[in-house]
A protein has these predicted regions:
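Conserved short loop/turn motifs at secondary-structure junctions
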Residues: 1, 99-104, 181-183, 254-263, ...
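Basic, low-complexity terminal or inter-domain segments flanking catalytic cores
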Residues: 2-3, 90, 118, 173, ...
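Intrinsically disordered, low-complexity regulatory segments
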Residues: 1-162, 166, 465
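Phosphate-rich ligand and nucleic-acid binding surfaces
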Residues: 221-223, 253-254, 324
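C-terminal or mid-to-C-terminal helical accessory/interaction module adjacent to the motor/catalytic core
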Residues: 93, 135-217, 254-258
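Metal- or metallocofactor-binding catalytic centers and their adjacent structured scaffolds
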Residues: 232-265, 271, 542
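Amphipathic alpha-helical transducer elements in NTP-driven molecular machines
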Residues: 9-16, 33-36, 40, 76-87, ...
Length: 689
C-alpha cells in the first residue's frame, strides 16, 4: 500500500476522494491501495533551548550564545496524537511507499521531512507537486509523481531557514531581554521589517513642511501653471504682471501613449491590492485565498510568479469565460483575451500565478461569504485585465508664454480604454470615491495662438511628509528590500517570502512593536526603542535580503548550507560580545513598565515583577521568586505579589487557606524565607503557638 501525507485534513480529504480512499479511520482514510493522512501543519519543530540543557530554562546573559552542536527536534505538544498516527502508519508493514502531498513549496517540504525523519522512516517516497486541488489536477499529479530525492535541496534550504531563525531569534531575544529586563523579541526577518516602520515614522516626525505657491494663468477652459514659487510676494508679483495681459501658445506637443495591462497576481500583489481596495490585512487575505484554494476555487496561493506556462492556454481561456459567466460583476464584459501576454515558462518555477479554477463553474458564488466573494472578484478582475487590450491615450503638453514667464499644463484624451474599462467597472462596484485624474481633456488650440486678457491667480501649498506604511506599501517595501545591494543578474527576494510576510506583520502587532491605526501600520514606543538599541546587522533589510537570496541559492544547489549557518553563528556571537553590559540609564530605556516590589535579600538590588516571577535586577544575582514554585503549589497556593512584597520586606508572611492531603480542612501558617543563596529559593513553615 501507499501512504499519502497531506498538510491538513481538508487537503487530505480532496486527495482521498480522487484516490478512492473513502473509509474513515482514526487520523486517516483508507481505500484501494492507498492510506491518506495529514499533518495539521508543523507536527515536528526544532526543540526549545531548554531541551538541550535544563539551565537554559532560565534566561541568562552568561549562557549566550546558545548554538546546538547537534540539532534536536520535538513533536508539537498539542499535535502529539496525530504524530503517533503517522509514525504508526509509516511503520505499518503494509506500507511500501509514501507520497509527500504537503504544500508544494519550501515550508511544505519541511513539514513532511521532519515528520519522516522523526519517525525514523526509511521507506522510499515520491513527491506530489500540484498548483490546484481540482480533481483533474490531483489525478494528473499522481500520474506524474516525482522522486522525493529531487527535492532534497529544497528541504535543505527550508531547514537552513528554520535553524537560522532559531539561532537569531533565541539568542537575540534572550540577549536584549536580559539586558533590558523586558521581553524584546528579535527575529531574522521581523526586526528589519520593524526597522523600516521606525525609519519611516522618524522621517514623518522630523519632517518640517515648507510653504510654496503656484501661479495660474488662463482663459476659458485653458489654464496653465507656474509651480513651486518660493515666496508669496514673488508669486503675487508674477500674477499681477500677467493679469489682463496677452498669453501665447509657445509650445504644443501631442504624443500617443499606451499603458500595458498589469500582470497576473502573485500572492504579495494580491495582498497589496486587497488591502488597498478592501482594507484586508495581509494575513486576512492569505487566509481567504487559502480557504478558496481548499474549496478548489483558486489555484495555489503561496506563489511568487505572475505568469502561467504555455500548456495552460486552453485552461486560461476556459477560466476567463467562466469568470464572465459566474461573477455577476463581469457578466456584461466581452473580451478577446491575449493569453500570450501572461505566458512565460521561464518565469514560472514552483507555481504559476493565482487564477480562478474551472471548478468555479459549479459554484453558487452568492452562497460564499462576502469576504471570499471579494477575493474572487479581485482575482477575476485581474485575469480579465491582464489578458485585455492595451489602454491607449493621446497626451497633450501646452506651454503658455506671458510677460516672459512660462506656464505649463498637460491633458489627455482616451483613444482606446482597453483593460482599464474592466478596472473602472470593478472600482465603480466598490462605491468609493476615486481621486480625479489630474490630466483632463484640453481645449483645441494651436502653436502660436494668442489668448488676450488672461486672468491670473495664486494658490498656497505645502510640501507633504512621507505617508505611514499601509500593509500595501509595507509589503511592497519588503518585496524590494535590499535590491540595490545586488547586481542585475541576481534574482532579488527581499524580506521574507510571499508565504511568510503576512505572519511577520502579525507578529510585530501581537508583540506590541507595531499597531494598526486605520489602514496605517505605526511602530509603538517599544518598537522604536528596540530598533534604536539593536545593531545594524540585525536591523538591516539589505543583510536579511541577502540571507534570503542565499537560501534561494541553497535550494538551487549553488550555495552551501553549512557555510550559510556558520555566518549566522558568527554574526550572533559577535552580537553577544558587542553588548557586555549597559549603563544604568540605558537599562532603564524600557523600564517604564517595570514595577519594583522590594530589595533583594542577597545583593540589595531592586526586585521587579516579571512574567510569572519576581526577579533581582542584578544580572549577576540569581535570586528569583516564582509564582508557581513547588513549595506553594503543593499547598495549592500561588506566590502572589502581596506575599512576595511581605517576604522581601519582613522575611516572613502569614498565609491563609493552605492545603494538606492529610486533613480535609485548610489551615493557616507563617511562611519564612529560608534562602541559602543556592539556585532556588527555599521556604520554611511555622505555626502559631
Amino acid at each position: 500500500m501507499i501512504l499519502v501525507i497531506a498538510e491538513k485534513p481538508s487537503v487530505a480529504q480532496s486527495i482521498a476522494k480522487v484516490l478512492g480512499a473513502t473509509s474513515r479511520k482514526d487520523g486517516y482514510m483508507e481505500g484501494g491501495n492507498y492510506i491518506v493522512s495529514w499533518c495539521f501543519g508543523h507536527l515536528v519543530e526544532l526543540a526549545d533551548a531548554s531541551s538541550y540543557d535544563e539551565r537554559y530554562a532560565k534566561w541568562r546573559y552568561d549562557d549566550l550564545p546558545i548554538v546546538p552542536e547537534s540539532w534536536m527536534f520535538e513533536v508539537t505538544k498539542d499535535k502529539a496524537q496525530q504524530f503517533k498516527v503517522l509514525s504508526a502508519l509509516m511503520k505499518d508493514k503494509r506500507i511500501t511507499e509514501l507520497v509527500c502531498a504537503t504544500d508544494a513549496g519550501r515550508e511544505g517540504e519541511l513539514i513532511f521531512r521532519l515528520v519522516y525523519d522523526k519517525a525514523g522512516c526509511t521507506k522510499p517516497f515520491k513527491r506530489l507537486w500540484i498548483s490546484s486541488l481540482e480533481d483533474s489536477a490531483i489525478r494528473e499529479g499522481f500520474q506524474h509523481l516525482r522522486d522525493g530525492k529531487e527535492y532534497d535541496r529544497l528541504y535543505e534550504a527550508a531547514l537552513s531557514r528554520s535553524k537560522a531563525d532559531w539561532i537569531v531569534g533565541i539568542n537575540g531575544t534572550r540577549l536584549f531581554t536580559t539586558l533590558y529586563h523586558k521581553k524584546l523579541v528579535v527575529g531574522r526577518v521581523q526586526t528589519p521589517t520593524l526597522a523600516m516602520l521606525v525609519e519611516r515614522d522618524g522621517k514623518i516626525s522630523t519632517f518640517q513642511k515648507e510653504k510654496y505657491f503656484n501661479v495660474h494663468v488662463g482663459k476659458g477652459d485653458l489654464t496653465a501653471d507656474l509651480e513651486k514659487v518660493k515666496t508669496e510676494e514673488e508669486a503675487k508679483r508674477i500674477a499681477a504682471a500677467c493679469e489682463k495681459k496677452q498669453a501665447v501658445v509657445s509650445s504644443l506637443k501631442r504624443e500617443t501613449k499606451t499603458v500595458n495591462p498589469p500582470k497576473l497576481y502573485d500572492l504579495t500583489t494580491l495582498q497589496r491590492e486587497a488591502n488597498r481596495y478592501y482594507g484586508f490585512t495581509a494575513q486576512q487575505t492569505l487566509d481567504l485565498v487559502q480557504t478558496l484554494y481548499e474549496k478548489k476555487l483558486l489555484t495555489y496561493p503561496r506563489t511568487d510568479s505572475q505568469f502561467i506556462t504555455d500548456d495552460m492556454e486552453d485552461t486560461a481561456r476556459q477560466v476567463i469565460s467562466i469568470v464572465c459567466r459566474q461573477l455577476p460583476l463581469f457578466s456584461d464584459v466581452s473580451v478577446t483575451p491575449d493569453i500570450a501576454r501572461v505566458t512565460d515558462n521561464s518565469k514560472v518555477t514552483d507555481h504559476h500565478a493565482i487564477l480562478p479554477t474551472v471548478q468555479l463553474e459549479k459554484q453558487d458564488v452568492s452562497a460564499l461569504p462576502q469576504s471570499e466573494q471579494k477575493i474572487l472578484n479581485l482575482v477575476g478582475m485581474r485575469l480579465l485585465c491582464a489578458t485585455g487590450e492595451k489602454h491607449t491615450y493621446a497626451e497633450t503638453q501646452i506651454s503658455l508664454s506671458c510677460e516672459s514667464y512660462t506656464f505649463k499644463t498637460k491633458g489627455k484624451t482616451v483613444i482606446q480604454n482597453g483593460w482599464k474599462a474592466i478596472e473602472e467597472l470593478f472600482k465603480a462596484s466598490l462605491k468609493t470615491k476615486e481621486k480625479d485624474d489630474p490630466m483632463k481633456s484640453l481645449p483645441e488650440v494651436h502653436e502660436g495662438d494668442v489668448l488676450d486678457g488672461v486672468s491670473a491667480s495664486v494658490t498656497e501649498h505645502f510640501t507633504t511628509p512621507p505617508m505611514q506604511y499601509t500593509e500595501d506599501t509595507l509589503l511592497s517595501a519588503m518585496e524590494t528590500a535590499g535590491n540595490d545591494q545586488f547586481d542585475d543578474d541576481t534574482e532579488k527576494k527581499g524580506l521574507g517570502t510571499p508565504a511568510t510576510r503576512a505572519g511577520i506583520i502579525e507578529k510585530l502587532v501581537k508583540s506590541g512593536f507595531a499597531e494598526r491605526k486605520g489602514k496605517s501600520l505605526i511602530p509603538t514606543k517599544d518598537g522604536c526603542n528596540l530598533v534604536c538599541v539593536l545593531p545594524e546587522q540585525i536591523t538591516s533589510p539589505a543583510m536579511t535580503a541577502e540571507w534570503e537570496n542565499t537560501l534561494m541559492e541553497i535550494e538551487r544547489g549553488n550555495a552551501d548550507a553549512d557555510t550559510f549557518l556558520s555566518g549566522i553563528v558568527q554574526m550572533t556571537g559577535d552580537l553577544v560580545k558587542a553588548y557586555p553590559f549597559l549603563s544604568d540609564a540605558e537599562a532603564q530605556r524600557f523600564g517604564t513598565g517595570k514595577e519594583e516590589i522590594g530589595k533583594c535579600p542577597r545583593c540589595g538590588s531592586p526586585v521587579y515583577v516579571g512574567k510569572g516571577n519576581f526577579y533581582c535586577s542584578n544580572k549577576e544575582c540569581s535570586f528569583c521568586l516564582w509564582e508557581d514554585n513547588k513549595f506553594f503549589s503543593s499547598k495549592k497556593k500561588k506566590l502572589t505579589k502581596k506575599i512576595a512584597k511581605e517576604l522581601l520586606d519582613k522575611g516572613w508572611c502569614r498565609v491563609t487557606g493552605l492545603y494538606t492531603p492529610k486533613k480535609p480542612q485548610l489551615y493557616d501558617a507563617v511562611i519564612r524565607l529560608d534562602d541559602s543563596g543556592g539556585k532556588y529559593v527555599s521556604f520554611k513553615m511555622e505555626f502559631d503557638r
